[in-house]
Amino acid sequence: MEYQGQTGHATTDKVEEYGQPVAGHGGATGGPTGTHGAAAAAAGTGQLQPTRDDHKTDGVLRRSGSSSSSSSEDDGVGGRRKKGMKEKIKEKLPGGAHKDAAGQQHTPAAGEYAGTGTHGAEATGEKKGVMDKIKEKLPGGQH
């Protein structure tokens, strides 16, 4: 098998960069046949120069590090309204008050309990790990 850009071999069959036979004349002493780009320029010099498409990602899709939330929310009347900067920041903060179906923040009425979900972590002075928090939320009691 003769590679593109190689000269001086006994065979006169030319093949392209993918190994397919190339029809043409020129043999070992002629110019390049069936080549293009940088490989065609290098073929006359006897150097093997692979051609490849210039892609920065090499076929891998990458995501940016930024995260964003929706810039609008349901206004409760069937339409949508733009969120303000304050609402966007509140939405990203952990442990905020949950919204009900109408999109309004729920504040506890008299007699309702608005706990933070930490059961006695302040009393012992130890912080819960991520796994402990997940286990606490799983149904079926304490694990």
Curated annotation (Swiss-Prot):
Induction: By abscisic acid (ABA) and water stress. Residues 1-10 have a biased composition (Polar residues). Residues 1-143 are annotated as: Disordered. The keyword Metal-binding does not apply. One of its GO terms (cellular component) is cytosol. Belongs to the plant dehydrin family. InterPro entries: Dehydrin (IPR000167), Dehydrin_CS (IPR030513). This is Dehydrin DHN2. It holds the Pfam family Dehydrin. The keyword Lyase does not apply. GO terms for biological process: cold acclimation; response to abscisic acid; response to water deprivation. It comes from the Eukaryota. Residues 35-46, 62-71, 109-123 have a biased composition (Low complexity). Residues 51-61, 86-101, 124-143 have a biased composition (Basic and acidic residues). Keywords: Stress response. Residues 24-34 have a biased composition (Gly residues).
